[in-house]
């Protein structure tokens, strides 16, 4: 249990029938009249739904213990991603639905943070940027500027992103895992 005065970004709360909500934003408000309160923006850990919720200041809320572990992606087994714990070398099978958009950037050997609560995997978190190889892209034509200087490219994971015209097949690039944006070339 924690007080609403102790809220901070990233804290996971157990509310409304045992659902887990992560604090995205919070603001302590002390109006001129009346009691103080805490205005929060909460994100459902499983569904990703974001809601605004207001708590009275000092009210006790139940916190959830979320165990985050660094794991290495090993291989795919049907619709499951198999991760290996970097400390114990135990393997963990995670359903594609739980992995979500992180699947677009997972290559064998990549490290990710796996969050669990009471043995259930909540989500897979990747670093903000990863380095991937361009598997296929059309050659960029010098005079072709009608598309704003970008062209589609397929990454080694099969995910498609837009890259600048000068990028060629086989090049290693840095990609933002949150937005799928091209960040730059990787110097060999």
From Swiss-Prot:
GO terms for molecular function: translation elongation factor activity. Gene3D superfamilies: 2.30.30.30, Nucleic acid-binding proteins. PROSITE patterns: EFP. One of its GO terms (cellular component) is cytoplasm. Keywords: Cytoplasm, Elongation factor, Protein biosynthesis. GO terms for biological process: peptide biosynthetic process. It is found in: Cytoplasm. The keyword Transcription does not apply. CDD domains: S1_EF-P_repeat_1 (cd04470), S1_EF-P_repeat_2 (cd05794). Pathway: Protein biosynthesis; polypeptide chain elongation. Coiled coil: none annotated. PANTHER family: ELONGATION FACTOR P (PTHR30053), ELONGATION FACTOR P (EF-P) FAMILY PROTEIN (PTHR30053:SF12). Belongs to the elongation factor P family. HAMAP family: EF_P. Involved in peptide bond synthesis. Stimulates efficient translation and peptide-bond synthesis on native or reconstituted 70S ribosomes in vitro. Probably functions indirectly by altering the affinity of the ribosome for aminoacyl-tRNA, thus increasing their reactivity as acceptors for peptidyl transferase. This is Elongation factor P. It comes from Streptomyces coelicolor (strain ATCC BAA-471 / A3(2) / M145). The lineage of its organism: Bacteria, Bacillati, Actinomycetota, Actinomycetes, Kitasatosporales. The gene is efp.
């Amino acid at each position: 249990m924690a007080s609403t005065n102790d809220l901070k970004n990233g804290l996971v709360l157990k509310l409304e029938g045992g659902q887990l909500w992560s604090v995205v934003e919070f603001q302590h408000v002390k109006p001129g009249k009346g009691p103080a309160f805490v205005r929060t923006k909460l994100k459902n850990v499983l569904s990703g739904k974001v809601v605004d919720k207001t708590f009275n200041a000092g009210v006790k809320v139940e916190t959830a213990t979320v165990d985050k572990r660094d794991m290495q992606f090993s291989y795919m087994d049907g619709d499951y991603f198999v991760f290996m714990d970097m400390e114990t070398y135990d393997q963990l099978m995670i359903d594609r639905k739980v992995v979500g958009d992180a699947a677009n950037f997972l290559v064998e050997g990549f490290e990710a943070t796996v969050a669990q609560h009471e043995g259930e995997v909540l989500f897979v978190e990747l670093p903000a940027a990863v380095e991937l190889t361009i598997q296929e892209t059309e050659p960029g034509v010098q005079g072709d500027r009608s598309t704003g200087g970008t062209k589609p490219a397929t990454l080694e994971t099969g995910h498609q992103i837009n890259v600048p015209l000068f990028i060629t097949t086989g090049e290693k690039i840095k990609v933002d895992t949150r937005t799928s944006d091209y960040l730059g070339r990787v110097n060999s």
